[in-house]
A protein has these predicted regions:
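Lipid interaction determinants
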Residues: 2-69, 82-211
C-alpha cells in the first residue's frame, strides 16, 4: 500500500478509501431505475485506486461513440460511498452517493437518482473482474485546475477529461485503444477524437496515489 504522493488543491479533503474497492476493476452487469432495467446497451468500466477513480460509460442508444464519463475521489462511510465528480463529461461536477453490499463476485449499489426532476430509486450490480496488486492514479492540471485523471491497473489504462474519455488495453506490451468517445461534435475526419488522444498521450501526468 502506497501513500498519497500529492494532495492537489482541488482534492477532496474528506476522501476516504473503501478497502473492498481499493485496486478493483468493476464492470456493471445491470442497472434498474424504479425497478425497470435501463441502459442495457451501455458498457461501463470502473477502475478504483484508493480514493481516486474513473467511471467510463459507452454505448448509449447503442452508439459506441456516445458516452458519459466522470472521475474524482470517493468518500467511504459504511455502508455508503460518495463519488465526487471532480471531472464530468456532462459538465456536472457534483457528487452522488450509493449504499453498497459486497459479495464474493462484486457488489450491489442502491441509491436515488433524479430523472426528469423526479427522485427515483436505482440499483446497480457490479461484477469484480480483477484485484490488482498495484493501481496508480495520475492527474493532469491546467492553470491550477484539474484537467484529467488517468488510472493504470494491470492491463487497463483509462483516461477521463472534460471533453471525453478513452480506455486502453495492454496487448503484449502495446497499449491498444479499446474504447473512446468525445463530447465534441462529430467531425468527418475524426479530428476531435485524435485531439483527445493526443492530449492524453502528451499531458503532464503527476502521480496522485498508488494502491
Amino acid at each position: 500500500a502506497g501513500a498519497c504522493c500529492n494532495t492537489p488543491p482541488f482534492g477532496v479533503p474528506s476522501a476516504n478509501a473503501c478497502p473492498k474497492l481499493t485496486g478493483k476493476r468493476l464492470v456493471r452487469e445491470y442497472m434498474l431505475i424504479n425497478d425497470a432495467k435501463v441502459e442495457d446497451s451501455v458498457e461501463v468500466l470502473w477502475l478504483q485506486c484508493k480514493t481516486w477513480f474513473v467511471d467510463i460509460r459507452t454505448g448509449f442508444n447503442e452508439d459506441p461513440g456516445k458516452g458519459w464519463a466522470f472521475a474524482g475521489q470517493i468518500e467511504w462511510e459504511e455502508p455508503s460511498v460518495t463519488f465526487y465528480h471532480l471531472i464530468d463529461t456532462d459538465g456536472d461536477t457534483g457528487s452522488d452517493c450509493g449504499s453498497f453490499v459486497f459479495t464474493n463476485l462484486g457488489c450491489l449499489e442502491v441509491g436515488e437518482v433524479i430523472r426528469d426532476n423526479v427522485l427515483l430509486p436505482f440499483e446497480e450490480k457490479w461484477l469484480r473482474f480483477a484485484d490488482s496488486s498495484s493501481t496508480r492514479a495520475f492527474i493532469a492540471e491546467n492553470d491550477n485546475q484539474l484537467a484529467a485523471v488517468k488510472i493504470q491497473q494491470a492491463k487497463y489504462t483509462a483516461c477521463v477529461s472534460k471533453i471525453g474519455a478513452a480506455i486502453y488495453v495492454d496487448q503484449g506490451g502495446v497499449l491498444e485503444l479499446d474504447r473512446v468517445f468525445t463530447t465534441r461534435e462529430k467531425d468527418t475526419g475524426g479530428g476531435s477524437t485524435i485531439a483527445l488522444l493526443d492530449y492524453f498521450a502528451s499531458a503532464h501526468w503527476q502521480l496522485a496515489e498508488t494502491s
